[in-house]
């Protein structure tokens, strides 16, 4: 690539041949993952870099210079083990809220049930911005994802998938098997009560409104772990039928290859991970978009 995709999986270092923006998804991922990242003009024309292709490298980036050389396998293994937590991490997952709630009724401390993205945006609606600055909408709690997964026995299926030695040791097999699993999630049925509640939420939006269904998990937008680009958001257009289509597409993204690899590296319990949803009118005619990072 000249410009790396936002869906970049875990890597040991990044070089781009085009200038990056400080708040690009790629740069945010590099900061979060503590990996070196630099723009280097015409890197493959540089023999000192090109000669290292397909081998282990030592790569260090400072504000005005970089160092790159061949590395030993021991150096590589030591580097990654130093980055990983030593114990399994269990993200907070509160399933006590069992209903879809308007954003104006969701508070900051309800992130344990809706995810930080949803609760943060809901809280911003109380900041006094001009009407329309922060979109109105609804939050769908983790409870819905958990009930959907249990209804289809997907937790058990995921465990069987993960226990397969080929899945654990073959990255291509793992990628393909996760793709199959996501397809199963998208095609799976929902209990009728869930379909009814999703339809009631959808009907509450003005007629013909495209609704943006955004991921809001308990393992992104957290202190020290942004999760930028790991999960997928979808827009439900008026001619697409029941909004469960988009909901299931976002639920399936919990098992994106890049998301699975990131959780696995950080030893985050896959079955404690939960998907909340932030639903609001889709932004129309936007001139640009990006990521905002506060000083705290």
Segments (PLM) and residue ranges:
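Short, flexible loop/turn elements at secondary-structure junctions
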Residues: 18, 217, 281-283
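Glycine- and other small-residue-rich loops at beta-strand/loop junctions that grip anionic moieties
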Residues: 12-16, 113, 280
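Alpha-helix C-terminal capping segments
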Residues: 28-34, 126-128, 295
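Short beta-strand elements
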Residues: 232, 281, 291-296
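N-terminal beta-alpha lobe that positions the nucleotide/phosphoryl donor
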Residues: 1, 41-278, 287
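Extracellular/luminal Protease-associated
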Residues: 1-43
């Amino acid at each position: 690539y000249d410009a790396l995709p936002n869906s970049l999986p875990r890597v040991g270092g990044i070089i781009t041949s085009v200038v990056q923006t400080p708040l690009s998804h790629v740069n945010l991922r590099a900061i979060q993952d503590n990996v070196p990242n630099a723009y280097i003009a015409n890197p493959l024309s540089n023999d000192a870099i090109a000669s290292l292709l397909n081998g282990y490298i030592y790569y260090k980036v400072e504000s005005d210079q970089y160092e790159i050389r061949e590395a030993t396998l021991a150096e590589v293994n030591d580097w990654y083990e130093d980055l990983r937590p030593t114990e399994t991490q269990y993200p907070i997952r509160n399933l006590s809220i069992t209903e879809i709630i308007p954003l104006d009724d969701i508070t900051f401390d309800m992130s344990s049930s809706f995810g930080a993205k949803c609760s943060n945006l809901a809280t911003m609606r109380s900041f006094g911005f001009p009407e329309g600055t922060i979109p109105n909408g609804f939050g769908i709690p983790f409870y819905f994802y958990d009930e959907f997964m249990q209804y289809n026995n997907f937790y058990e299926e995921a465990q069987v998938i993960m226990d397969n030695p080929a899945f654990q040791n073959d990255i291509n097999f793992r990628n393909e098997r996760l793709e199959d699993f996501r397809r199963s999630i998208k095609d799976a049925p929902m209990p009728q009560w869930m379909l009814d509640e999703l339809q009631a939420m959808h009907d509450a939006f003005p007629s013909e409104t495209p609704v943006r269904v955004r991921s809001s998990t308990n393992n992104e937008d957290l202190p020290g772990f942004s999760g930028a680009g790991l999960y997928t958001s979808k827009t439900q257009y008026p001619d697409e039928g029941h909004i469960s289509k988009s909901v299931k597409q976002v639920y399936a993204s919990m098992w994106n290859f890049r998301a699975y690899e990131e959780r696995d590296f950080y030893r985050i319990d896959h079955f404690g991970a939960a998907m909340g949803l932030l639903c609001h009118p889709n932004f129309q005619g936007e001139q640009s978009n990006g990521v905002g990072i506060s000083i705290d």
